[in-house]
């Protein structure tokens, strides 16, 4: 990724996706840019909660565990960048739509959160079907 810095952008799939070196001092969409201490503390606290949920509350649900591992992995990756460099390197730029440049860790967090929401929804649906019409 550092090799992209002097180049600026390098097409990966023409007109679809390119690699573009961008330094992001904020979180998603550069929100809270320049608030490094807050972002480090808030991210660390959120990751501790996710780790707690993974190790003590996931009830042997493999899909939920996979979701939480994705969130942890992506969150830790971005946290390491932020602690060591004061910013996160983003490098994936989708050319077919107007969207922020992001990185692989962001993908892991987003997919993990979406999967976690799906697991919670499916668990609720399963609980409702177990109760039956009289208990609802």
Language model regions located:
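Alpha-helical transmembrane bundles and membrane-interface segments of multipass inner-membrane proteins
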Residues: 1-136
């Amino acid at each position: 990724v550092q090799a992209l810095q002097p180049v600026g952008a390098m097409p990966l799939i023409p007109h679809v996706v390119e690699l573009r070196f961008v330094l992001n001092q904020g979180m998603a969409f550069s929100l809270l840019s320049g608030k490094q201490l807050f972002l480090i503390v808030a991210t660390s606290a959120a990751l501790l909660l996710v780790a707690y949920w993974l190790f003590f509350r996931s009830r042997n649900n493999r899909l939920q565990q996979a979701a939480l591992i994705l969130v942890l992995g992506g969150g830790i990756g971005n946290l390491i960048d932020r602690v060591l460099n004061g910013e996160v390197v983003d490098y994936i730029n989708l050319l077919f739509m107007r969207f922020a440049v992001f990185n692989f860790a962001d993908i892991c967090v987003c997919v993990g959160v979406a999967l976690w929401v799906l697991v919670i929804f499916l668990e609720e649906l399963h609980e409702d079907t177990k109760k039956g019409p009289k208990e609802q």
